[in-house]
Regions:
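Glycine/threonine-rich flexible loop motifs
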Residues: 138-150
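Glycine-rich, charge-decorated loop segments at or immediately adjacent to ligand/cofactor-binding or catalytic sites
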Residues: 91-96, 165-187
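Glycine-rich oxoanion-binding loops at beta->alpha junctions
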Residues: 99-129, 141
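Acidic, His- and aromatic-enriched active-site or binding-groove loops in soluble protein domains
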Residues: 184-196
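Bacterial Sec-dependent N-terminal signal peptides
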Residues: 1-31
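Short internal beta-strands
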Residues: 80-88
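A short helix->loop->beta-strand "cap" motif at the edges of active sites that frequently abuts
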Residues: 77, 159-163
Length: 196
């Protein structure tokens, strides 16, 4: 668990680590088991049970073949809102297409877009929410907007004294880091942080 202070506001960020079984020798290939944060329900559920929960999720937010929203609802978790990144909650929007606020047809939960005119949850969006859970697969490329959406979600949670739980998913390109660090004058939504 990481605890960060931001202007006197304490936020807790829980990164549920994945377990990767390493090979015993370079010449021997063994099966690796990856357990994502969302699959560790025994750790997640006690942190969100009896709380009003908002989720920032998309089509990659699955536990097995079941979406995290559906999994949490099965456990009677009070999911009150869904925040949608680029491509939308169900992944049906094209790259660069504005995502609109809506109601999810399956669950009837309100979806608030964080891709379009609005990039950051407002105080009103977080009203009556106790904890926000972030679970989105990223590919580790700076220009992917999911890390920018997480950046602004972190700010909003800190500013509104809301707990944020970040569920870890392994980066498929995590072994390779390359490129210059972003210069501040080029900062934008497709490059919000000074990373390679």
């Amino acid at each position: 668990m990481f605890v960060a202070m931001n202007k006197g506001i304490l936020i807790s960020i829980l990164v549920l680590p994945f377990y990767l079984q390493s090979c015993s020798a370079p010449s021997t290939i063994q099966k690796s088991e990856i357990i994502c944060g969302a699959e560790q329900l025994e750790k997640l559920l006690p942190l969100i049970r009896e709380k009003n929960v908002a989720l920032l999720v998309n089509q990659t937010s699955v536990v097995g073949l079941t979406h995290l929203v559906d999994t949490l609802l099965t456990y009677n978790i009070k999911v009150k809102k869904i925040f949608a990144p680029e491509h939308g909650f169900r992944g049906s929007a094209d790259a660069g297409e504005h995502v609109r606020d809506s109601i999810d047809e399956k669950t009837k939960i309100k979806i608030i877009s964080l891709y379009g005119d609005k990039k950051k949850p407002s105080t009103d969006d977080l009203k009556n929410i106790d904890v926000v859970v972030f679970d989105v697969q990223d590919v580790g490329a700076r220009f992917y907007t999911f890390i920018s959406t997480l950046h602004y979600l972190l700010e909003a949670c800190a500013e509104n004294n809301k707990q944020l739980i970040v569920l870890d998913r392994p980066n498929p390109n995590g072994w390779y880091v390359d490129g210059p660090v972003l210069k501040k004058e080029f900062q934008s939504f497709v490059g919000v942080d000074p990373i390679p």
